[in-house]
């Protein structure tokens, strides 16, 4: 019969996986009100590059145009 693994095996594996993976959630920038910017996504790509995307957060008072884009980092990833 096989022996059950120690209760610490899975938490240790979990911690090792998260230590080796560097999370990159991206960056955000607010570029103005949605009533003044007709297409948030196109405006974000114009200002922040082709990998940017945008959406209108309807938080009241005309909404806010929010851009998400990859963060620029000085670190070299291997």
Curated annotation (Swiss-Prot):
Organism placement in taxonomy: Eukaryota, Viridiplantae, Streptophyta, Embryophyta, Tracheophyta
Gene behind the chain: LCR63
InterPro entries (UniProt xref): LCR, Scorpion_toxin-like_sf
Protein name: Defensin-like protein 173
Record carries keyword Glycoprotein: no
Biological processes annotated in GO: defense response to fungus; killing of cells of another organism
Keyword vocabulary terms for this entry: Antimicrobial, Disulfide bond, Fungicide, Plant defense, Secreted, Signal
One cellular component (GO) term of this entry: extracellular region
Main location group: secreted
Signal peptide: 1-23
Family classification: Belongs to the DEFL family.
SS bond list: 27-71, 34-56, 40-65, 44-67
Source organism (scientific name): Arabidopsis thaliana
Localization: Secreted
Gene3D superfamilies xref list: Knottin, scorpion toxin-like (3.30.30.10)
